[in-house]
Amino acid sequence: MSLPGAIELPDGALVRGRGLRNPTPEGTPDYGLYLGSPRMRRAVMARVDAPSWKHEWVEWPDFRLPKAPADAVVLIRDLHARAVAGARVEVACGGGVGRTGTVIACLAVLAGVPSGDAVAWARTNYNRRAVETPWQKRWVARFPNVTSAG
């Protein structure tokens, strides 16, 4: 059973992208990967609808790249493995566009899309504004061989 709003990656795995500033949608995931600042994490976890399911956080400032790129790659790979195994997974940042779109593009790479085509794939299949900055686009192009935030 998939999550409402989930998209299908080229390898058949399903993932839901969303914005944490929006109300939590219907459908409880088995696992969530959340992208944001420590402040955002505190705010989300203080809400009535805070994630009660297994989840991880990546410190990833808005319009930027992850603070610990190698750790982010490990968590993105783990998210993909869970999705391939049939778990209901989601990825989310504040608005659900730039950082979330960047991770969805990285998931597309893991699902077989050439890294040079992954941003276009995410914009076609997830959100037309996915991957908002030039450095996010470069990060996807180098994924999963990313060793730095720059």
Residue ranges and their predicted role:
Residues M1-E90, V103-G150:
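Cys-dependent protein tyrosine phosphatase-like superfamily
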Residues G96:
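Conserved G/P- and acidic residue-centered "switch" motifs that form tight phosphate/ATP-binding loops
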Residues C93:
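Short cysteine clusters
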Residues T100:
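Ser/Thr-glycine-rich phosphate-binding loops at phosphate-binding pockets of nucleotides
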